[in-house]
Amino acid sequence: EHVKGRIGMTFIHGTGMDHTVWTLAGRHFARRDLNILAVDLPAHGHSDGDLIPSIEGMADWVIKAMDAAGQEQSIIVGHSMGSLVAFDVAARYPDRITALAMVGTALPMPVGEVLLNSAKEDSPLAKDMINFWSHSQAGHLGGSQVPGTWMIGKLNRLLERAGPGVIHNDLLACAEY
């Protein structure tokens, strides 16, 4: 629920993911009286619509989502692909953003040919590669800072929910930004 006068915080997920990656962070900041908006980009999670093939297009969509949520200004947080989207929002709409946090980012964000081709074929190998490269050695051994959380299993389930073409679209957008 948006409360007028509170600081906004907008979360943008990474490739093939959805808003659920921000559940714990969203709760943390909501308890500190921030207005939380954790988006599902079009064709991700519970969001309808067509895939957006560019980071710039995703950034424009995020601004529309902020408008719909009543967030005139916001702290913006993005993970991986979402960090590029957040960066683009902050660069092109600086009057709307009070702070920027980029998690798991690189600029440029190159994507290997094997990964991109595997994603184009909707091969499970693409999801396996993303999951392998997304976690530390401790994570692969079951280590997690949150008791009872298996991050590799969680990301597996999340990527399995991605619709056809979603991961390829997202990776290609990162590679071309």
Where are each of the predicted segments found?
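Short beta-strand-to-loop junctions in surface cap/lid or active-site-entrance loops
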Residues: 1-7
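Flexible "cap/lid" loop of the alpha/beta hydrolase fold
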Residues: 84-132
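Active-site glycine-rich loops that stabilize anionic/oxyanionic intermediates
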Residues: 6, 14-17, 80
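A generic "structured core" feature
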Residues: 12, 76-77, 85-88
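Structural cue for short, hydrophobic secondary-structure segments
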Residues: 11-14, 38
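Alpha/beta-hydrolase active-site loop signature
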Residues: 16, 41-45, 107
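Conserved alpha/beta-hydrolase catalytic His-Asp/Glu region
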Residues: 117-177
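Active-site loop/oxyanion-hole signature of alpha/beta-hydrolase fold enzymes
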Residues: 23-81
